[in-house]
Amino acid sequence: MLTAGVDHQDLAKRGESLIRQSSNRYLTTVRIAFRAKQRRFDDFDGLLEESSVKPVQRAIVELSDEQDQPDLLPG
């Protein structure tokens, strides 16, 4: 995960990968926005300690990881 900062090239590649592998770009964008909104409220509530990473950046990384490694998901 991201701790001290953001590798912008890696973030761009992850975002492009999410869009490229999706069947619907709009729904992917909505998923990213929804996840970012959740992370923003988690930050506000003090549940997350990684406040140096913006919620949208964190959402892209999380969704990209879920897409690339589906075996890590519970269930």
Curated annotation (Swiss-Prot):
Might you give the EC number(s) for this enzyme? 2.7.7.6
**Magnesium as UniProt keyword:** no
Reactions this protein catalyses = RNA(n) + a ribonucleoside 5'-triphosphate = RNA(n+1) + diphosphate
Class of the enzyme per the UniProt entry, highest EC level: transferase
> Which GO molecular function terms does the record list?
DNA binding; DNA-directed RNA polymerase activity
What the entry lists under Pfam families is as follows: RNA_pol_Rpb6
Q: Which GO terms describe its cellular component?
A: DNA-directed RNA polymerase complex
An annotated GO BP: DNA-templated transcription
Any coiled-coil ranges, and where?
A: none
Sorted UniProt keywords: DNA-directed RNA polymerase, Nucleotidyltransferase, Transcription, Transferase
Tell me the protein family, please.
Answer: Belongs to the RNA polymerase subunit omega family.
According to its UniProt entry, what is the function of this protein? Promotes RNA polymerase assembly. Latches the N- and C-terminal regions of the beta' subunit thereby facilitating its interaction with the beta and alpha subunits.
HAMAP family from the xrefs? RNApol_bact_RpoZ (MF_00366)
Question: Assembly state and interactors?
Answer: In cyanobacteria the RNAP catalytic core is composed of 2 alpha, 1 beta, 1 beta', 1 gamma and 1 omega subunit. When a sigma factor is associated with the core the holoenzyme is formed, which can initiate transcription.
This protein is called what?
DNA-directed RNA polymerase subunit omega
Please report the organism this UniProt entry assigns to the protein.
Answer: Synechococcus sp. (strain WH7803)
